[in-house]
Amino acid sequence: NLEAGKPIVETDFDLRFNEQTYRVESNLGPLVADAIHWYVNQTHHNDFTLAVAGLIRDEIKPGTNGEQLVNDLYRVVPLGSGVFDNSAGYSLAQVYLTAAEIKNVLEAMMLAPKLSTGNYPYWAGIQYKYNPRRILLDQVYEVSLGDPVNGYKRIDLSKKNENLYSLTTNNYVLEFFGLVQEVTFGLLKVSPKDRYGNPVTDLNDLIIDGKPEQAGLQEMKEWEGFIQYLSQFPDVNGNE
């Protein structure tokens, strides 16, 4: 029930982003990651979420009255199309990883922006510590999962920890996981798995079904999650 001209949220400050000059300091990139993380957790358990700079396409500015319409917000993450339904927007997917593989992903994503600024990551649901003085691809030494409200819990990064943790991203970014070994020259490996720990070769099998109680696959879209997240913000100035 989203109409292009429907007001969703108001802001009195800029939410800034520029892939080349303002990606590290951006307050919009983390918002996109937070939105996806919240959206998926409404229907599925999700441990942490990844969004990347290269798929953010517009900033959010207050304009004359601060109102942000559906079409304003859609322009932030408008790219892609469905895997099966061919509707607008990249679909969200969920992959399961071991703690050691999470470390490998973090190591790879610290390297990835050096290959392309579009690879700069924005995370939600995860905190990590690294030492830049350590050798490349072995700098992450602590990872915690959680959220600011309930706190973060450190996880065991050793290979003896066989627990699986869920990561959500869109289907485009998910393809990168198959390239981790290539990007790291074979030093790091990640084996995408389903929730049962079975290795997955067709990454399309990891697309999230937003309404599993219905027949078929109802793809969850990145842009829809962004808008739904903002739409649940309270009206603080009483002009709803």
Label every PLM stretch briefly.
Residues 1-240:
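Catalytic centers of hydrolytic enzymes
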